[in-house]
Amino acid sequence: MLNQVEVLREEYVEGYVVQMWRRNPSNAPVIEVFTEDNLEEGIIPEYVTANDDTFDRIVDAVEFGYLEELELV
């Protein structure tokens, strides 16, 4: 199944959804932030370095109101 999205981690935080996903097993995972009502279009760019530590830091940033700073990256 080419281009099938596999969600590796997902967390709902303060009206947002933080997802770590990849298109297929040979692709590196990416992290993206969405609003809960629109899971089709991310509100910040996909993060290239997608690992558990980066995921946790992004979840914390969203939870503590630093979403604007993430958008500048």
UniProtKB/Swiss-Prot annotation:
Intrachain disulfide bonds: none
Domain of life: Viruses
Protein name: Putative gene 60 protein
Organism: Bacillus phage SP01
Gene it is expressed from: 60
